[in-house]
């Protein structure tokens, strides 16, 4: 077992280690297993150029100084260079270790045993100010080890940002908080502008793709509750494609999302983060992503962001501006 200290030690994917806070975690969220035998060559449209601009380095410096995690880094997002070079980042709250282990996700998995950085809400707000953000996306790991799933901590962070500047728009990509409505209310009762929760995949593939504690209809019921409780809050969800689903199943998932009042949906290509994760079953063409967007808009979504490189928070501020949603 390896231990993280002040000297940076490379931890191999799939191995167990001890964090700075004394609890154990698994690197990249999936234990070592036999490498998936299916490998599909990545098409040209998915190849990204690295660009370490001054703005990129500024974002990296600010998040490091304030001890913040970003989903950009932890989930190995392919858009990190583009987003950071434009001065935007998706801040991941409550640490970099998740209590769940979805088979597509490279965030480390473990039991933080109640650990939280009490200074994180204020540190996050200060980072947002330093980055001059007008629109900020917050997300977090799942924290099933906490009584309220971390909802109170999450809400405190939103409030700290709004107290800093009430004109800053906040999108909260939250856990499901185990479906406990009192915990969801803590987020709703802030001045949050958008609440998102990702359905990730079609109903048939939910069990093999997501952690057993997550659920297709659990996510949809969460989004239904938010819209019923506070109709003025925009709701959003996201689908990964390339995991073995059919286009018909994607359209059915769109219908299910619309049935609970979801306003915005994003669709992007799943890319295997390590050899231990689910393999890619197909690469969807840019033309097919354009078709998903056309169909989604016909189904009544206010906006559909659809493309090979699209992720839930990708260009989130621009998504809304295109439809003049006053965000």
From Swiss-Prot:
Amino-acid positions noted as binding [4Fe-4S] cluster 2 in the UniProt annotation, renumbered to this chain: 98, 102, 105
Domain of life from the UniProt record: Bacteria
Pfam families: LIAS_N, Radical_SAM
GO cellular component labels: cytoplasm
Keywords: 4Fe-4S, Cytoplasm, Iron, Iron-sulfur, Metal-binding, S-adenosyl-L-methionine, Transferase
Main location: cytoplasm
Record: residues binding [4Fe-4S] cluster 1: 72, 77, 83, 313
GO molecular function, one term: 4 iron, 4 sulfur cluster binding
Disulphide bonds in the chain: none
Pathway the protein acts in: Protein modification; protein lipoylation via endogenous pathway; protein N(6)-(lipoyl)lysine from octanoyl-[acyl-carrier-protein]: step 2/2
Cofactor needs: [4Fe-4S] cluster
The EC number(s) this enzyme carries: 2.8.1.8
Catalytically driven reaction(s): [[Fe-S] cluster scaffold protein carrying a second [4Fe-4S](2+) cluster] + N(6)-octanoyl-L-lysyl-[protein] + 2 oxidized [2Fe-2S]-[ferredoxin] + 2 S-adenosyl-L-methionine + 4 H(+) = [[Fe-S] cluster scaffold protein] + N(6)-[(R)-dihydrolipoyl]-L-lysyl-[protein] + 4 Fe(3+) + 2 hydrogen sulfide + 2 5'-deoxyadenosine + 2 L-methionine + 2 reduced [2Fe-2S]-[ferredoxin]
Residues covered by the Radical SAM core domain: 83-302
UniProt enzyme class: transferase
Protein localization: Cytoplasm
Cofactor binding note: Binds 2 [4Fe-4S] clusters per subunit. One cluster is coordinated with 3 cysteines and an exchangeable S-adenosyl-L-methionine.
InterPro entries, sorted: Aldolase_TIM, Elp3/MiaA/NifB-like_rSAM, LIAS_N, Lipoyl_synth, rSAM
NCBIfam families with a match to the protein in the record: lipA, PRK05481.1, PRK12928.1
PANTHER family in alphabetical order: LIPOYL SYNTHASE, LIPOYL SYNTHASE, MITOCHONDRIAL
Protein family: Belongs to the radical SAM superfamily. Lipoyl synthase family.
Name of this chain's protein: Lipoyl synthase
UniProt source species: Francisella philomiragia subsp. philomiragia (strain ATCC 25017 / CCUG 19701 / FSC 153 / O#319-036)
């Amino acid at each position: 077992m390896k231990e993280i200290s002040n000297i940076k030690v490379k931890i191999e994917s799939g191995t167990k280690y001890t964090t700075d806070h004394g609890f154990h975690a698994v690197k990249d969220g999936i234990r070592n297993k036999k490498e998936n035998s299916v490998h599909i060559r990545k098409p040209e449209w998915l190849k990204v150029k690295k660009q370490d601009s001054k703005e990129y380095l500024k974002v990296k410096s600010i998040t490091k100084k304030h001890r913040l995690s970003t989903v950009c880094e932890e989930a190995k997002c392919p858009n990190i260079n583009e987003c950071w070079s434009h001065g935007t980042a998706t801040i991941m709250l409550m640490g970099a270790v998740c209590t769940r282990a979805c088979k597509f996700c490279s965030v480390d998995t473990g039991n933080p045993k109640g650990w939280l950085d009490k200074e994180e809400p204020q540190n996050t707000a200060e980072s947002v100010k330093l980055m001059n953000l007008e629109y900020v996306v917050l997300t977090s790991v799942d924290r099933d080890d906490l009584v309220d799933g971390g909802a109170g901590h999450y809400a405190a962070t939103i409030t700290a940002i709004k107290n800093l500047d009430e004109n800053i728009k906040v999108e909260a990509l939250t856990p499901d908080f185990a479906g406990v409505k009192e915990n969801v209310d803590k987020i709703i009762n802030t001045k949050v502008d958008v609440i998102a929760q990702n359905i990730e995949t079609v109903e048939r593939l939910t069990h093999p793709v997501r952690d057993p504690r997550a659920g297709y209809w659990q996510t949809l019921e969460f989004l239904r509750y938010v819209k019923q409780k506070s109709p003025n809050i925009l709701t959003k969800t996201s689908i990964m494609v390339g995991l073995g689903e059919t286009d018909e199943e994607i359209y059915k998932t769109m219908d299910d999302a619309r049935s609970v009042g979801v306003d915005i949906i994003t669709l992007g290509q799943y890319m295997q983060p390590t050899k231990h994760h689910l393999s890619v079953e197909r690469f969807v063409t840019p033309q097919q992503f354009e078709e998903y967007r056309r169909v989604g808009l016909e189904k009544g979504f206010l906006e559909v962001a659809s493309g090979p490189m699209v992720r839930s928070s990708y260009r989130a501020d621009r998504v809304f501006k295109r439809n003049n949603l006053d965000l």
